């Protein structure tokens, strides 16, 4: 068996996407990857508690240089942005070209780019009268939500749906 891909997950908030990744890894649904570190942009990110509970090493890195140092220390082969609310600097994108993926809560190209994150996306979808929404996983490039799309999953927007 080949060595597993070492994944660092960057977070800023509650960590629901992180928890989904932790659960999938624990269930054997991500057999080729292992989360080696969770790096948060804020000390109060609940995602840090989720990671600690799962036995995953954590760090808080507020500045780009700190993020790069933590990534290098982790030995990560790949980076997943799971609710990470900062734009990565060019140096990190260049160092990890085509090895950084983002989970975005809309069907790109709709409701993406600067200012579209979290509940703001869901609110805009509802206000736009959309009949479907979903999530997009894409590679990260120098733009905001402009990288190559890896996959999308559609879900219907139901009457009575809320941004929550």
Where are these regions (language model features)?
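One-carbon transfer enzymes
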Residues: 1-164
């Amino acid at each position: 068996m080949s060595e597993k891909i070492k994944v660092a997950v960057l977070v800023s908030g509650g960590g629901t996407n992180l928890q989904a990744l932790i659960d999938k890894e624990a269930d054997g649904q991500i057999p080729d990857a292992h989360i080696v570190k969770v790096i948060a942009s804020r000390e109060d990110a609940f995602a840090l508690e989720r990671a600690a509970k799962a036995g995953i090493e954590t760090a808080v890195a507020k500045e780009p240089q700190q993020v790069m140092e933590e990534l290098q220390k982790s030995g990560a082969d790949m980076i997943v942005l799971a609710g990470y609310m900062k734009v990565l600097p060019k140096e990190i994108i260049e160092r990890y070209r085509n090895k950084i993926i983002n989970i975005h809560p809309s069907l790109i190209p709709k409701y993406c780019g600067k200012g579209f994150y979290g509940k703001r996306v869901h609110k805009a979808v509802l206000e736009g009268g959309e009949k479907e929404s979903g999530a997009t996983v894409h590679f990260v490039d120098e733009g905001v939500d402009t990288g190559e799309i890896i996959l999308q999953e559609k879900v219907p927007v139901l009457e009575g749906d809320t941004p929550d």
